[in-house]
Amino acid sequence: MVELYNDYKLMDEIKDNQGNAGALWKDLAECIKWQQEQADVLPDAHWVGGNPWDGKKANVDGWAAWNGKKSVLTLRNPSASAQTFTTTLREALDIPAYVRGKITLTHAFNQAELDGMPINKAIDIDTPLVLNLPGSSVFIYNGR
């Protein structure tokens, strides 16, 4: 069972880029559709990156999942300042050492480009990725 609590007034008030109220309802529907499309990979979800707050600093964190056929990767910079995060897809997706290959990432949602993240290009899972996340940002990717 899943429960979802909404602030109806807030959901109704927020406007989209054209000034139409109720934009958050569309966003919620888009997220639910994405979740349904990723239902086969999401059970593998695990944490990625650092501790969101280690007592001194807000660190880049997120979650990822991989099932051998597809993957999802979410990265978040909770800090107001830009931060650099270095990883490989093997490390982020927790891919076993015996697996070799490449993954092509695409944007899961309409989002800005992330400096250092190749999109729509096959990435060897052991290639280091040096990612520059702007402050207060979230990036979500689908992978195949």
Summary of predicted features, one role per range:
Residues E113-I125:
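Short beta-strand and strand-turn-strand segments in soluble, beta-rich domains
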Residues M1-A112, P128-G135, G143:
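Active-site-proximal substrate-binding groove within the catalytic cores of carbohydrate-active enzymes
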